UniProtKB/Swiss-Prot annotation:
Keyword Cell cycle: yes
Entry function: Together with skp1, essential for septum processing and cell separation.
PANTHER family: RECYCLIN-1, SEC10
Organism: Schizosaccharomyces pombe (strain 972 / ATCC 24843) (Fission yeast)
Subunit composition and interactions: Interacts with skp1. Forms a complex with pof6 and skp1.
Name under which the protein is recorded: F-box protein pof6
InterPro entries: F-box-like_dom_sf, F-box_dom, Sec10-like, Sec10_HB
Cell cycle keyword on record: yes
GO MF annotations, alphabetized: ubiquitin-like ligase-substrate adaptor activity
Gene Ontology CC entries for this record: cell division site; cell septum; cell tip; cytoplasm; cytosol; exocyst; nucleus; ubiquitin ligase complex
Length: 872
């Protein structure tokens, strides 16, 4: 080994030995525990014990001077602001030197920061320029509590913590020197007079602040039975102080002493928070409000001579005005006395006044009872309208919400139920009234029949009994005077009294029956006549199946309900949504009551009566009265539909989107309109059946058997007019077409006109096939067809004109002389003339109606079927 290498090896061995020796000495000083554990232990021991540990050795002195221990204690006293401390550190970072602390020591701060530079600043060194800007950091002297300066130190000691990590130990020493003597003195005190906290500090504001500081100071003590007993003693003293302040506060409430209330409310607010004095304040105000209001629900209602109950709104208005005055005065009083008046103003309005008025409303509702639903609805909506005055004052909305929140849901359900019940009852009463009228009318006619029958039966029995002896013992003869006298007496009894015949029969008719004055002059005397009279009376009553008065009543009832509901609008979004939902439900119920309940039943009853009408009879006038009545009924239904449109535009348009098909109100309105259209169309279909059947009846009865088969050419004048049957049919249908104008929509009119035209075309086709036509008869038929064509043209239905033009072409088949049979065949096969309405087979069938068909059949068949062809 070279000398240099040997020397380096020796030096390395010496260094290893010295390092080993140094570690052994360090372990001998600190034992086997780490520095972090020692710091944790020092944090948990009391301050006097910490001072004793500091005297053990120099290393313990260094550990006891670590600022992390005192930062922890200041944190327990809630006197250390971590955020502010970090901010101050970064501001003075340029003037600080980084402390050479291990990473384990940085965990003793418990500052929860990832920045090791800030955490390692336990014992920093400041530059001379930085020291000039810092406050005096000398070890403080003991505090003299009898001087003003000493009191000021105590009252500001926790507020004057520098919030710098490097001075945490000095800050804690200041707090200890100021508060520890007072803390021990108060903890071992036997009364509330001798302790320094009450003797040196005389005002309640100073005493409350000192007590708060002492409680915070006690939180920095380590846990243990002895120290916990001292803290409990401090807390007991604080409770006594708080109770004394509450007693003074209560005294101020009783005497309405503003200065006393203002003083102790601020003391209590700073010392223990607002809960204690706010609870006492509200409790006293509850008793005052109960004594202020004297509610008597029985005096609110007034009964008139008709035993109808009304509400005395003056009483409710005075209650609202008194509440506003009380709320305003209380608001001014709390603002003048309390540090945070809103803490009592909201509970006062919501819990005290609100609950008092809520109990008043509940007592009135209980007095009203469940049977007087309308009175309940009127009261709730009316009183809510009066209470809207509360919205103009502070905390008024909360007061209104407390009063009416339990009642609004009940109001919504009851309002809908009330409208549904009353509306359907009106509809049921109307239906019952109609049924009673029909039953009364039927009974009236059958009663007359039964009276005549009973009278005839009685006279027949009287005749048999009285004449029985004569017929047994006397030979009957034409000259028998007794028999003649008896028969004359019976005939005289059967004759009507001329004086009685002069009386007006309408005087003896009940008011609830369908009987016209003309019918009263000829009352039925047989059962068959009575049945006809009952049917006619029902048909006369078709136009009264709907009642505009009933519709107006139900609409007015719905408007009243909507007006009551709208009072609750404008308070809050959820409540507005509930009221809008109620309004839509009311409108839906209105449409159902008028649609399904009234109009549908009326249409069904009218259609039933119309179906029982026999159109195959003659009328005194040229009208089918039931059809006219039904058209009038459609007109009334259209007026009710227009009422609903107007009602929707006025009441529902602000809350409904017109094209929103998912809206229940819009959907129900569409159903209502569809119901009217369907029932009107079905009724018009029945009416068309009646019109066409009567037109068939006119064609049958007004057409003589040989009208079209007469072959006397000389009797035909130069101008051939339409037949009486055609004139009557056109006049009859034209009248009903004109009367429908203005009573139905344009679409319904078009459908009605087309249906009448097509049905008339079918009837005329059957009519032509059922008669035999000569050439002269064909001319008459052509004149009739021209009249029918003009009638259809007046309806402005272009789709019907080809059919009636074809009828004119059909008439040409009859005006060609039989000698020209080949021309007749060619005309029948001309598809351009008949293809719009008839096939060739149908035209061929119509040709059978010619009176000379058998004579021309062979020639016509040759043209139509090609019988003249031959094979060469």
């Amino acid at each position: 080994m070279k000398p240099s290498e040997a020397r380096e090896h020796a030096i390395r061995k010496i260094k290893e030995y010295l390092e080993r020796r140094h570690k052994q000495q360090f372990k001998a000083l600190f034992g086997c525990l780490t520095i972090n554990i020692y710091l944790k232990i020092f944090t948990l021991i009391s301050t006097p014990d910490l001072c004793n540990c500091r005297l053990v050795c120099r290393k313990f002195q260094q550990l006891c001077d670590y600022n992390s221990i005192y930062v922890k204690k200041l944190l327990l006293m809630n006197a250390w602001d971590v955020t502010l401390s970090r901010k101050l550190y970064y501001e003075s970072q340029d003037g600080m030197s980084q402390a050479n602390m291990s990473s384990n020591t940085s965990k003793g701060f418990h500052l929860q920061s990832s920045d090791k530079k800030y955490a390692d600043s336990d014992r920093p060194k400041l530059s001379s320029s930085s020291l000039l800007s810092l406050p005096d950091q000398k070890i403080p002297f003991p505090v003299d509590y009898s001087t003003v300066q000493g009191k000021q130190v105590v009252l500001t000691v926790l507020d004057c913590v520098s919030q710098r990590v490097e001075f945490a130990r000095l800050d804690y020493i200041k707090v200890w020197r100021a508060l520890a003597p007072i803390y021990r003195n108060l903890a071992y005190a036997s009364n509330t007079i001798d302790p320094i906290a009450f003797s040196a500090f005389r005002t309640p504001e100073e005493q409350s602040k000192v007590l708060k500081y002492l409680i915070r100071f006690g939180n920095s003590y380590p846990y243990g039975t002895y120290r916990q007993a001292m803290q409990n003693a401090i807390l007991d003293m604080a409770s006594l102080f708080e109770q004394a302040c509450l007693d003074e506060f209560e005294l101020g409430l009783h005497s309405r002493n503003l200065d006393l209330l203002r003083k102790f409310s601020h003391v209590l607010h700073d010392f223990s928070g607002p809960n204690a004095y706010v609870s006492m304040y509200l409790a006293k105000q509850t008793d005052f409000v109960r004594s202020f209001f004297h509610f008597d629900p029985y005096s609110l209602f007034i009964s008139n001579n008709l035993e109808e109950i009304h509400i005395n709104w003056n009483i409710l208005e005075s209650v609202v005005n008194d509440t506003i005055k009380l709320l305003e005065s209380e608001s001014k009083f709390s603002e003048a006395t309390l540090p945070e008046p809103e803490l009592v103003q909201v509970p006062y309005a919501k819990d005290i006044l609100g609950n008092s008025l809520k109990d008043y409303v509940i007592s009135i509702c209980e007095h009203i009872g469940e049977e007087e639903t309308e009175l309940f609805l009127v009261f709730i909506s009316g009183f809510y309208g009066l209470c809207k005055k509360f919205f103009s004052i502070p905390n008024g909305p909360a007061l209104v919400d407390t009063i009416f929140q339990p009642q609004i849901d009940i109001f919504i359900s009851q309002e809908l139920h009330y409208f549904k019940t009353v509306g359907w009852s009106l509809v049921d009463q109307w239906d019952q009234k109609l049924e009673e009228k029909e039953d009364a009318t039927e009974c009236f006619f059958y009663k007359n029949v039964s009276q005549n029958t009973a009278k005839n039966n009685f006279l027949e029995t009287f005749k048999n009994v009285m004449l029985l002896p004569v017929s047994l013992f006397t030979i009957p003869s034409e000259n028998n005077s007794a028999s003649n006298l008896a028969e004359k007496a019976i005939e005289q009894k059967e004759e009507e009294d001329p004086e009685l015949s002069k009386l007006d029969a309408a005087r003896f008719v009940p008011a609830n029956i369908y009987v016209s004055k003309d019918r009263l002059k000829h009352l039925p005397t047989t059962e068959l006549a009575a049945q006809a009279a009952v049917l006619d009376s029902k048909l006369e009553g078709i136009s009264t199946m709907f009642s505009l008065e009933l519709a107006l009543k139900i609409v007015h009832l719905c408007k009243v309900s909507l007006a009551r509901a709208k009072v609750f609008m404008g308070t809050s979004v959820p409540q507005d949504d509930d009221i809008k939902g109620l309004s839509k439900d009311l409108f839906v119920q209105l449409l159902r009551e008028l649609g399904q309940g009234h109009l549908k039943h009326g249409f069904d009853r009218a259609i039933e009566h119309l179906s029982s009408f026999d159109p195959r009879r003659d009328f005194s006038s040229n009208t089918v009265e039931p059809v006219v009545k039904f058209l009038e009924l459609i007109n009334v239904g259209d007026m009710i539909q227009q009422m609903m449109d107007s009602f929707f535009n006025e009441e529902m348009s602000p809350i409904c989107v017109k094209d929103d098909m998912f809206d229940p109100a819009i959907a129900e309105k569409k159903k209502f309109e569809q119901l009217l259209d369907e029932r009107a169309a079905f009724g018009l279909h029945k009416g068309i059946n009646v019109l066409i059947e009567h037109a068939d009846f006119l064609l049958e009865t007004k057409t003589p058997m040989n009208l079209f088969s007469d072959q006397t050419i000389g009797s035909i004048t130069n101008t051939i007019e339409p037949t009486a049957a055609a004139k009557n049919v056109v006049q009859f249908l034209g009248f009903h077409m004109r009367i429908l104008v203005g009573r139905a929509d344009h679409e319904i009119l078009d459908v009605f006109y087309k249906e009448v035209g097509m049905r008339l075309f079918d009837s005329l086709t059957r009519y032509i096939k059922s008669h035999k036509f000569s050439v002269d008869g064909g001319l008459k038929l052509l004149s009739d067809c021209n009249l029918y064509y003009e009638f259809i043209h007046s309806l402005h239905q272009s789709s019907l004109l080809p059919y009636f033009k074809t009828l004119k072409e059909i008439a040409h088949l009859f005006i060609i002389d039989g000698k020209n049979a080949e021309e007749i065949g060619k005309l029948a096969t001309d598809t351009s003339r008949f293809s719009s309405a008839f096939h060739t087979e149908e035209v061929y069938e119509i040709l059978h109606s010619r009176i000379d068909w058998l004579n021309i059949k062979y020639e016509v068949d040759k043209v139509i079927h090609g019988l003249a062809c031959c094979i060469m």
